[in-house]
Amino acid sequence: MTKQKLILAYSGGLDTSVAIKWLSKDYDVVALCMDVGEGKDLSVIKEKALLVGAIESIVLDVKDEFANDFVLPALQYGAHYEGAYPLISALSRPLIAEKLVEVAHAQGATAVAHGCTGKGNDQVRFEVSVAALDPSLEVIAPVREWKWSREEEIAYAKENNVPIPINLNSPYSIDMNLWGRSNECGVLENPWTEPPQDAYALTVAPEDAPDQAEEVIIGFEAGVPVSINGTAYPLAKLITELNIIAGAHGVGRIDHVENRLVGIKSREVYECPGATVLLKAHAALETITLTKDVAHFKPILSKQYAETIYNGLFHAPLTKGLKAFLTATQQDVTGEVRVKLYKGNATVTGRQSAVSLYDEKLATYTKEDAFDHEAAKGFIKLHGLAISTHASVHRQEGVKK
């Protein structure tokens, strides 16, 4: 009997390697591995999938698509879940789901699978995205279904000749892409315990960072970062370069206890050196290029966008509407921002734009002052008219009583 095809989102780790063997009982498994900037040797991962039992192993380089279509809107919104988490893993999941569906269609597969556990956010993100893109596809979650302990999973791997990763004894659960690195589990599960240095990989300890500050100038065109110190880069490459530059100064460490979608609190340690610099630089440029009403309203939608992405609703109609508003706000976000990097800090020290709304002649207190001071009197009277009327009415009522 011919087996039906299944496309598995494959990482090369123990869970998805065991999943290939487990799923192969009922399906012809096609392993799909995507490069979103995690820095792995994907050729090794491709061969490992075939060794374990996949009938085909596909590797896709999606770094540019990830940067331009998923990271960029989050950057332009200044999106942070609960004001802290810059959506590192949450941004890559809808793209991975899109590619799962695309390959499933190309291969004539009837099902897709992922390696998420039953208590994380990613299972929701994958499955809701697949349902939005093609609800006819079956989604299988082997790790959630088999309910093995780690010891039982290792025993199964050994019995079925599945290679055991050399980093299996690491206490951490790590996910990484262009936008940063997420780390949880092990000693990090105690929110009182300070993260040890081995919990970090992209950043040096701030106290060990250089004693000499470094300044970088980020160039933007219509809200898109396009250059570092005058050198132009595609967005994915620009983020990668900034990860190296800012990481060397200990910039971008975040220690956060967040409220997961599934109802639990989770302590996470994030590293996002490039993201930290870009988010600060972009926000600084908007202070001189957005009008007051847009600048005050945009953070409301930024919070909504962050929660929408975090909750796995990238492919929901709301996201399309939020992006439409965002596009309208970015046309004038063009200019340069200077950022100083020093011992864990990224400090904006200057911003300039050819379309800046900051008028020094209106702002100055020198003799160059062009502000119409006489106009202030009438403005104040009208601005306070409602409150002064209210006060007058209630003062009269008090007299009557």
UniProtKB/Swiss-Prot annotation:
InterPro entries cross-referenced by the UniProt entry: Arginosuc_syn_C (IPR048268), Arginosuc_syn_N (IPR048267), Arginosuc_synth (IPR001518), Arginosuc_synth_CS (IPR018223), Arginosuc_synth_type_1_subfam (IPR023434), AS_cat/multimer_dom_body (IPR024074), Rossmann-like_a/b/a_fold (IPR014729)
Taxonomic placement: Bacteria, Bacillati, Bacillota, Bacilli, Bacillales
Subcellular location: Cytoplasm
The entry's keywords: Amino-acid biosynthesis, Arginine biosynthesis, ATP-binding, Cytoplasm, Ligase, Nucleotide-binding
Record-given protein name: Argininosuccinate synthase
EC number from the UniProt entry: 6.3.4.5
Cellular component GO terms, alphabetical: cytoplasm
Entry keyword Phosphoprotein: no
Gene3D superfamilies per record: Argininosuccinate synthetase, chain A, domain 2 (3.90.1260.10), HUPs (3.40.50.620), Single helix bin (1.20.5.470)
Top-level division of the source organism's lineage: Bacteria
Binding site for ATP: 9-17, 115
The organism of origin for this protein: Exiguobacterium sibiricum (strain DSM 17290 / CCUG 55495 / CIP 109462 / JCM 13490 / 255-15)
GO MF, one example: argininosuccinate synthase activity
Encoding gene (name): argG
Stated family: Belongs to the argininosuccinate synthase family. Type 1 subfamily.
GO biological process: argininosuccinate metabolic process; L-arginine biosynthetic process; urea cycle
Binding-site residues, L-citrulline: 85, 121, 125, 173, 182, 258, 270
EC category: ligase
